[in-house]
Amino acid sequence: GEPLSVKIHEIEHPDILLWAVWCIQQYGKIVSLQKCVEKYGLLAKDIMMYLSTSSHPNLKVRENGLVYAQGKSKAVTWMNSTANGRPIVPRSGYIVEFNALWYNALKFSEEICQMVGRKEEEAHFAAMAVKAEQAFKDVFLNQYGYLFDYVDEKDQEQDWSVRPNMIFAVALDYSPLSLPEKKTVFDICTKELLTPKGLRSLSPKSGGYNPMYVGPQVQRDYAYHQGTAWPWLAGFYMEACLRLYKKSRVSFVERVLVGFEEEMFSHCVGTIPELFDGNPPYHARGAISFAMNVAEILRVVKLIEKYDI
């Protein structure tokens, strides 16, 4: 057949290629891993070779095996609100979801190379994954059982804020955490971040909590990722729940989904808005329809189907 032509947009952002590998991984669950590897395996492998050699201008692999991104002067994560040209949430250094995605991508690449008989590259990714697994725990896991949101070794900074980005280390197919560690992270997300409309972007117990997305633009910018609830994060939360507890928590996941049902009949009918206030009554805010939110709810509905209750 003809060579596969793929255009990935905005690859200058540090995490875009990691998400591209995740998308390929999800595609394999739909069509079979064999068909996925036949079509996209070489692309996934090439992406990971590019990243693993620190060729990306904004994502570098450090000596400890983790990836590092500079975000002090320019927002580089999905929490990208700015004021006066500077990030409001200056997430920089070792960023927790980047490294959860990185570890998952390394293990998936190892799996792909094993399937196609590329022994040398399989060993390369396997060795990197082993290194990253231990470093992830050393860098992110704190004595309270949750994960630092980011750690910037340059400024000797550990961000103790309880944020939802740690849920990816539980939800993804491959995790550097043990089962007890994953359960502790999940429990903290449940207790401090879960709302009927998604996960809060910041715990009410953390400094700077601002759950109401109201007021003039500058005021809303400061609240955007400081306590507002985001439905798309609930998708990964529910996936994490099913991954940990399987069939026994299907009814719980269904109850979480019910929280979005009424939104289908208000504002823009048949869809879900961008975000919600983090405190009751959880008013809808932002764009009246948000693709990431809709996609994640639909993905969880498909995840539930395989439990056949």
Where in this protein do the model-derived segments appear?
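Aromatic-rich carbohydrate-recognition surfaces in CAZymes
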Residues: 1-70, 96-99, 103, 228-253, ...
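Solvent-exposed loop and edge beta-strand segments that line ligand/cofactor-binding
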Residues: 3-17, 80, 84-100, 149-177, ...
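Charge-dense, low-complexity intrinsically disordered segments
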Residues: 34, 38, 89-92, 96, ...
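Catalytic cores of carbohydrate-active enzymes
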Residues: 49-68, 103-213, 255, 262-294
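Short, flexible helix-coil linker/hinge segments at the edges of structured domains or between repeats
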Residues: 63-86
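Terminal accessory carbohydrate-recognition/targeting modules of carbohydrate-active enzymes
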Residues: 111, 119, 226, 243, ...
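Amphipathic, soluble alpha/beta structural segments
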Residues: 119, 126, 135, 208-240
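C-terminal non-catalytic interaction modules
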Residues: 270-273, 305-309
